């Protein structure tokens, strides 16, 4: 409330007090205002209301942190990543330790918030979620257009860590190709007794594939017809690969596509932060470093909060 409005009300209350002898606080209560309001107004008589929203708080992001955030996000090229991804990426790289909600407000305030990735549709989760690496392996083929010719990308994806264990780019969708991938994955992880989750393609229902799975001491499960969510982890990885790599590059044949896709797979496993696993990399989760990395981030955030408190305390003194 402005000073003129408050002065007009208090003047009227005082006039009524002189006429009736009723205490001003009681008259305030007749107006539906707490008695404490009169004491507050009387204590700062003839003084404009001063809101404290402009007073720096100890948890405010410092100007230097804001500058670094604006510079980093302004120069970040991949606008398909959301603000949560950028928040934890900056924590890991030591740019600034701010929570996603804080980064959201800074981006909004500085006009650095373009159209990010669309929110995922709420879907069924399919099979029970794995609790450790090499418990569930997902596999499938995906079309990749290379110089006007269709190739077929296939991989084995760990369901717990989202790590791409093995992959290749084939010219056909023969069952032998997927059998080679499963064999390679078993050679890399001989102690694994994973459940291979796949669709109902003929490559996965053939006698040769089923015999190979039994011989390698693995298990297999087919997804329900017309229910791609059951194999959604590998389907989502295929979509990410096409969005971030395939549609951005121009391949001159399969020999040119393989090394470029290989570099992206290495980036996906070792550098790209994955939203489904706490914005960590698949390699970190697969190696059992999830709790260690989350604890490291919590420590960084704690020290950043303490540094901000010290900064604003020194500014006030």
Language model features: what each stretch is:
Residues 1-33, 42-52, 68:
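Residue-centric detector for conserved, function-critical "anchor" positions
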Residues 4, 37-136, 286-290:
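Basic, flexible linker segments flanking DNA-binding modules
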Residues 26-48, 103, 260-279:
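K/E-rich alpha-helical interaction surfaces of small helical-bundle regulatory domains
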Residues 71, 75, 92-97, 101-157, ...:
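Mobile-element integrase/transposase regions
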Residues 158, 169-174:
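A short acidic/small-residue loop/turn micro-motif
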Residues 188-206, 226, 231, 280-283:
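Acidic/histidine-rich, metal-coordinating catalytic segments
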Residues 195-200, 214-233, 249-254:
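RNase H-like polynucleotidyl transferase catalytic core
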Residues 214-216, 240-317:
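C-terminal domain-tail junction helix/linker
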């Amino acid at each position: 409330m402005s000073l003129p409005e408050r002065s007009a009300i208090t003047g009227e209350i005082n006039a009524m007090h002189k006429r009736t002898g009723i205490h001003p606080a009681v008259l305030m209560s007749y107006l539906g205002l707490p008695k404490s309001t009169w004491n507050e107004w009387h204590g700062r008589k003839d003084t404009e209301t001063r809101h404290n929203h402009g007073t720096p708080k100890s948890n405010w992001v410092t100007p230097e942190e804001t500058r670094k955030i604006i510079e980093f996000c302004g120069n970040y090229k991949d606008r398909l990543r959301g603000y949560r991804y950028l928040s934890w990426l900056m924590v890991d790289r030591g740019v600034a330790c701010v929570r996603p909600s804080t980064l959201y407000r800074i981006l909004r305030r500085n006009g650095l918030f373009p159209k990010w990735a669309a929110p995922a549709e709420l879907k069924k989760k399919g099979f029970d979620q794995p609790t450790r690496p090499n418990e569930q392996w997902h596999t499938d083929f995906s079309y990749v257009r290379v110089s006007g010719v269709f190739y077929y990308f296939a991989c084995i994806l760990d369901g717990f860590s989202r790590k791409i264990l093995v992959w290749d780019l084939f010219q056909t969708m023969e069952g032998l190709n997927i059998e080679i991938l499963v064999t390679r994955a078993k050679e890399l992880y001989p102690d694994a007794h994973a459940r291979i989750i796949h669709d109902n393609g003929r490559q996965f229902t053939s006698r040769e594939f089923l015999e190979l799975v039994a011989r390698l001491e693995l298990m297999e499960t087919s997804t329900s017809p017309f229910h791609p969510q059951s194999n959604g982890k590998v389907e989502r990885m295929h979509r990410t690969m096409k969005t971030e790599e395939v549609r951005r590059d121009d391949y001159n044949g399969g020999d040119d596509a393989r090394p470029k896709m290989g570099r992206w797979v290495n980036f996906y496993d070792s550098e790209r932060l994955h939203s489904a696993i706490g914005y960590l990399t698949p390699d970190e989760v697969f190696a059992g470093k999830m709790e260690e990395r989350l604890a490291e981030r919590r420590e960084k955030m704690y020290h950043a909060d303490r540094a901000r408190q010290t900064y604003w305390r020194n500014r006030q003194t």
